[in-house]
Amino acid sequence: MYEQAIVIRNDLKMGKGKMAAQACHASIQAFLHAQKISSSAVSGWMNEGQKKVVLKVNSEKELLEIFKNVNIEGLPCSLIRDAGRTQIEPGSLTAVGIGPEKEEKISKVKKDLKLL
């Protein structure tokens, strides 16, 4: 089974629409990265219904730690930096997208995170 995980910073107090937009940015960018490095995972994920899970962290430090661990594992990923046109400061790190990849690989880096 394949999945994609999206990790959102909860401490920024973004509105629901803003969080949804940041999650979409993270999902698309991670997907594009996955197409380059893991086409078999992308195909599997597409054929299985494109499962996604959205998780939260409470600080930029936690988000960067997740991003570092994802890179150590060699998973396709994205780190989203907001342009700052609406609710938050320009350059704020808002989200990380992980995968698509096999669930067991993503589980290594998301194991302690709570659902958004």
Swiss-Prot record:
HAMAP family: Pept_tRNA_hydro_arch
Primary location recorded for the protein, binned into one broad class: cytoplasm
Cysteine disulfide partners in this protein: none
PANTHER family: PEPTIDYL-TRNA HYDROLASE 2 (PTHR12649), PEPTIDYL-TRNA HYDROLASE 2, MITOCHONDRIAL (PTHR12649:SF11)
Name recorded for this polypeptide: Peptidyl-tRNA hydrolase
Record's subcellular location: Cytoplasm
CDD domains from the UniProt entry: PTH2 (cd02430)
Keyword Cytoplasm attached: yes
Species lineage: Archaea, Methanobacteriati, Methanobacteriota, Methanomada group, Methanococci
